[in-house]
Amino acid sequence: MNMASYLIAQCGMKEEVYADYAERNITIYSCPYFALMLIDGSALEAEWIDEWLSERMRKRRGNEVNGTGDGSSSGRDDDGISRYINCYIFLSRHRSESNKPTLTSHSTGNFSHASMGGNARELAYTYPSLQKCYMLNLYSNRGKVPNYDIVIEATHHGPTSLAKPVLFIEIGSSEREWSDMDAVSVTCHSLLASIVNFKEYSKKVGVALGGTHYPEKFTNLLIDSDIALASVASKHNLKHIDESMLRQMIAKSIEPVRYIILDWKGLGGEKDRIVNL
């Protein structure tokens, strides 16, 4: 059982099937708190979701207005997306060469070229409070998965152009962990707790620069302090951080960013340049 099937069973979700968008087969399960979409293809290239949801909302609104059932309304329903959607959460399998058992989360974006979905030099919107809620709940359940590392990842890959914040929640790093029911249960219950009992941490939000792809210092900061994090750029991407990119990191948080947080020892040869941006 994977994360999606576990949530469907736990929440008694209602199923709707669609096969009318770009030859995609799309199944949506819904409950009072969220909707779960099963999609074909790579989540890293899911820039089309806004358009698909907008079209569905437009048709539904047209049906309600004219009563004909033909969906004869026109234009994208961007207002519907803004009104009814808060965030896109992708449930994903994490892969790494180490195959180390890991429970992780991260925002998405490309600081340079787009080799894994999204657009070059574009960051997705972030929801710092939601990621912090999730990581705190995950950490509180760590005793149930003692062999797993619990860590955030630096911002990477697509999608990058969705109209709402994007958060990837992942179990890794091999097939054994993907089907581990302890990991699936802890991940799903931590996510549900974060949605149902959401808490804002918007007073202290920062962007983070430096460290490794699995930034232990920033993970500890997220868990042990009242700070929430927006985009995180690892030391490997610091050469791509200029004033424009730093401004984008700040602007793409839906909660006001008040801090720029540096891993001082993890800035490498870019330290002087980054400090003087």
Specify the residue positions occupied by each region the protein language model found.
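Short glycine/threonine-rich loop-to-helix capping motif typified by GTGT followed
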Residues: 215-224
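N-terminal catalytic or cofactor-binding beta/alpha core of small enzyme domains
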Residues: 1-157, 161, 174-175, 181-185, ...
